[in-house]
UniProtKB/Swiss-Prot annotation:
The modification Phosphoserine is found at S18, S92, S263. May play a role in the organization of actin filament arrays within muscle cells. Pfam families: DUF4749, LIM, PDZ. PROSITE patterns: LIM_DOMAIN_1, LIM_DOMAIN_2, PDZ. Residues 1-84 form the PDZ domain. This is PDZ and LIM domain protein 3. The lineage of its organism: Eukaryota, Metazoa, Chordata, Craniata, Vertebrata. The keyword Metal-binding applies. It is found in: Cytoplasm, Myofibril, Sarcomere, Z line. Interacts with ACTN2. Forms a heterodimer with PDLIM4 (via LIM domain). It comes from Rattus norvegicus. Highly expressed in skeletal muscle and at low levels in the heart. One of its GO terms (cellular component) is stress fiber. Its main location: cytoplasm. Keywords: Cytoplasm, LIM domain, Metal-binding, Phosphoprotein, Zinc.
């Protein structure tokens, strides 16, 4: 229902807007500041603004509506529409006012919520067909086996051994026994899905009654288990295979035979084996491993080549002083490798000639 609301100036007005033609939604008040002028004018969240100071909001964007509200200085006239009647009382809580909604509609309640069959008072039970040994409780008709209305049921004497028979004949009917100074109510239907053994429940009930009467409880003998030497037991155990020996691989068996067939006079112990680099003769056309010109072993990795001869980097030394000739000049004299000083000493020119060292061009 459209309503006209006037808020006295100046700003702030105390409410928040949302929507606009740019959002394809009407201008709606989303929040009211407690204690503000909007709350005093009884504005509520959810009110749709139809006009601001006489200007319709059908074609207003959100920014235009904010500008129109900011332009109002002395008072702000709003035309609002409320879909339903809202009660917005100013309730003060700890000095702050908070508008709230009140739903006056009563919620339906199930009248049968508190009526459940398990909440009824247990009724006493008597063994049908038994006429002696136990007296008949008040409120029980022995001839028909049906219970009659009675406020209090009492039992003068009770036979604990007959409880199992009574409970098994009517497992869903509660048993109520009033003994001197104690009252025992047994409702077997409270055990969900028969999770507990019926025999255990009966033994417990019989023990309680016997203890209350001052008698020694007589427990039934446990059911004998299946003998372990039955036909099925023997059939299952006779078909089992004997434990087989662990399986060994073919290589292990060959080594085991060699060890068993070997002579016993060989000395026992360990020996140190030093790995030796072997030169494998490759097939024709395959690249062979280079041999060191000094030590004669194969070269794996870095190699130094001088005049078609290969050496290890640590073997590339002078034959006299063992000076490493890497990054230095080297000389071959009679097939041996020397440094410059020892090469001059071993090479003496004829008389009248001087020794001149010639270095290859880079």
């Amino acid at each position: 229902m459209p309503q006209n609301v006037v808020l006295p100036g100046p700003a702030p007005w105390g409410f928040r807007l949302s929507g606009g033609i740019d959002f394809n939604q009407p201008l709606v008040i989303t929040r009211i500041t407690p204690g503000s002028k909007a709350e005093a004018a009884n504005l509520c969240p959810g009110d749709v603004i139809l006009a601001i100071d006489g200007f319709g909001t059908e074609s207003m964007t959100h920014a235009d509506a904010q500008d129109r509200i900011k332009a109002a200085s002395y008072q702000l006239c709003l035309k609002i529409d409320r879909a339903e009647t809202r009660l917005c009382p100013a309730v003060s809580e700890d000095g702050k006012a908070h508008p709230f909604k009140i739903n006056l509609e009563a919620e339906p309640q199930d009248v049968n919520y508190f009526e459940h069959k398990h909440n009824i008072r247990p009724k006493p039970f008597i063994i049908p067909g038994r006429t002696s040994g136990c007296s008949t409780p008040s409120g029980i008709d022995c001839g028909s086996g049906r219970s009659t209305p009675s406020s209090v049921s009492t039992v003068s004497t009770i036979c604990p051994g007959d409880l199992k028979v009574a409970a098994k004949m009517a497992p869903n009917i509660p048993l109520e026994m009033e003994l001197p100074g104690v009252k025992i109510v047994h409702a077997q239907f409270n055990t969900p899905m028969q999770l507990y053994s019926d025999d255990n429940i009966m033994e417990t009930l019989q023990g309680q009654v016997s203890t209350a009467l001052g008698e020694t409880p007589s427990m039934s003998e446990p059911t004998a288990s299946v003998p372990p030497q039955s036909d099925v037991y023997r059939m299952l155990h006779d078909n089992r295979d004997e434990p087989a020996a662990p399986r060994q691989s073919g290589s292990f068996r060959v080594l085991q035979e060699l060890v068993n067939d070997g002579s016993d006079d060989r000395p026992a112990g360990t020996r140190s084996v030093r790995p030796v680099t072997k030169v494998h003769g490759g097939a024709g056309g395959a690249q062979r491993m280079p041999l060191c010109d000094k030590c004669g072993s194969g070269i794996v990795g870095a190699v130094v080549k001088a005049r078609d001869k290969y050496r290890h980097p640590e073997c590339f030394v002078c034959a006299d002083c063992n000076l490493n000739l890497k990054q230095k000049g080297y000389f071959f004299v009679e097939g041996e490798l020397y440094c410059e000083m020892h090469a001059r000493a071993r090479t003496r020119p004829p008389e009248g000639y001087d020794t001149v060292t010639l270095y290859p061009k880079a």
